[in-house]
Swiss-Prot record:
One biological process term in Gene Ontology: protein secretion by the type III secretion system
UniProt lineage: Bacteria, Pseudomonadati, Pseudomonadota, Gammaproteobacteria, Enterobacterales
Protein name (database record): Secretion system apparatus protein SsaQ
Keywords, in A-Z order: Protein transport, Transport
UniProt record similarity statement: Belongs to the FliN/MopA/SpaO family.
InterPro entries: FliN-like_C, FliN_T3SS_HrcQb, SpoA-like_sf, T3SS_SpaO/YscQ/SpaO
Amino acid sequence: MLRIANEERPWVEILPTQGATIGELTLSMQQYPVQQGTLFTINYHNELGRVWIAEQCWQRWCEGLIGTANRSAIDPELLYGIAEWGLAPLLQASDATLCQNEPPTSCSNLPHQLALHIKWTVEEHEFHSIIFTWPTGFLRNIVGELSAERQQIYPAPPVVVPVYSGWCQLTLIELESIEIGMGVRIHCFGDIRLGFFAIQLPGGIYARVLLTEDNTMKFDELVQDIETLLASGSPMSKSDGTSSVELEQIPQQVLFEVGRASLEIGQLRQLKTGDVLPVGGCFAPEVTIRVNDRIIGQGELIACGNEFMVRITRWYLCKNTA
């Protein structure tokens, strides 16, 4: 699946699949081909952001106006005026300004990245852009609230489900002792380098799946609860049922979410082991750590040979000071 930045994840749910046209701008979530572009600095309420324009768009715009796209051969004030004219629809819609003291630079976009793509036209020249380093509220000012009519285009939207890379068991005492920077070893649901993960379907059903590069998902195993799925992997700690145990020593199932997958709801009604379905979605830049479906932290997935661990970058559990 594709990767996506945290600040762009809400737009996957807000924007229709085919995108939305708002004023002179067309917005859509899509993977843009890896290529060179030109990066401009904008100012939105004293916050700086970056607008990436595909190199072909910028080159055609400059050559159509002054016969060259060579920045070193263009007077800086003239270059600023050309850029401001080309970016005018975006700047006007967002109430941002182009920074004159920050000259444009060359920059390539990222591979396998799902990003918010913004398109507009000036004097029959088409511009394709991606926003880097978003100022707070910048795109909210562009989009505002999408109309109810647009949201009703899809009466049965895809089902979005969490994708888990692995799990571990930790007692309440162990969870309480975790601090930022520490590493937690995880048991994977399969070889994640090959695309093996687990997902949680509606109704509390879990599945072990294989994700492929051509955006399909094969269902290798379907179970009614997460404990059954965990038991088929690494051995879980079990009590002998006779000795007493303190509450703080009871192991908790910790799941590590690495992204979200979307499936058509109609395809899930007769789902069985071995089925292969088309899938959308994206991987998150950080691992989300869950206990009983509650988020308790975030971290970075790190490979250690054939083993994997998550280094804690955010931790939300409060220590008991009583």
